[in-house]
Amino acid sequence: MKPNYKPPFSRFVKKVHKPLQLAIEDAAEEVCDNPEIGEAKAGDLAGIWVYKFKFNRQEYLIAYRPPTPESRRQGVDVELLMIDFYQVGSHENFYGELKRYLKSER
């Protein structure tokens, strides 16, 4: 599956130092290899999944939306399916910022 990085995700990655950028890239690749590796959210964030990883004893979260099961069942080539990566960051204000971005995107 291919990653599709949304602006908040890309902005955060640009601002951080190289070792963390590489850790984020590795985590995104893990998600692309297995989209169900994270935890599905409910309520306001239904359809969004969050994958947690650690870097230098700090926990980071990646919010993403995997392809729907219907699109996977329809025989679409796995390499053509996109995973939308919305946000990455530490837990502080993560969900509030994510909700604000998703609301503005609609």
Located regions from the model:
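Arg/Lys-rich, positively charged N-terminal/basic patches that mediate binding to nucleic acids
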Residues: M1-A27
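Residues that form generic nucleotide/phosphate-binding pockets
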Residues: F12, A27-E30, E97, Y101
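Residue-level detector of beta-strand structural context in well-folded domains
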Residues: M1, W49-Y51, I62
